[in-house]
């Protein structure tokens, strides 16, 4: 992969608007042009052909990434993950199958973005089972109005997605509580140590004792997280704090790359490795 392709395709640099303009400046391919390039890559390993295929489809990744903007994650990161999926799709694309690259790539693009959202959305892993994943990514577009579903809507969504009505109600509750769970502060209550609602969103069958146990686990996990961060090297600690622990003005990969004099892809790798270590520390 060339330096130009890696720097543009993997990580939006500068403003999102400038990146979108650059991505849209690459011409779209005709079916004939696409097939010729795909054959050159597939049979000859032509990396210049791969570059052209990727750059001509960046606008499509932007289009897909925009549909995930409601989850509160940085648009640049969503695009970056989608671009990784696009690159994987180009590498696996067989020009003899008889479909356009865009039809083949959409599944790879969405898969990368899905995993990113599931790992990071609002910290809470609201989607842990197969049925919950399906609900997580379809519930928003199935809502016909603001507010809670009525019974007819619950039945319709459950039927469309092939899940139970109780699953629909549970996921709706979790998603509707996303802001409330993390925005509560001590000023919101006379209690100097208010219990955030997130502690009671895990399971509708939970009783109060379960909530207290969950509260204790969260405190334990927070302590383990603090200790785990201290085990990281100084650069990795800075990356995690700048990317995840700052309330405002979270740093982009490119900003951190400029700070440390490395590529944005290298920062992404360091972040990924650090996050893996932190997750393992919390789950132990």
Swiss-Prot record:
Name of the protein in its database record: RNA polymerase sigma factor RpoH
Gene assigned in the entry: rpoH
Gene Ontology CC: one annotated term: cytoplasm
Family in the record: Belongs to the sigma-70 factor family. RpoH subfamily.
Signal peptide from the UniProt entry: none
Gene3D superfamilies: 1.20.120.1810, Winged helix-like DNA-binding domain superfamily/Winged helix DNA-binding domain
Sequence motif: Interaction with polymerase core subunit RpoC, positions: 77-80
PROSITE patterns: SIGMA70_1, SIGMA70_2
Assembly and binders: Interacts with the RNA polymerase core enzyme.
Organism: Proteus mirabilis
GO molecular function: DNA binding; sigma factor activity
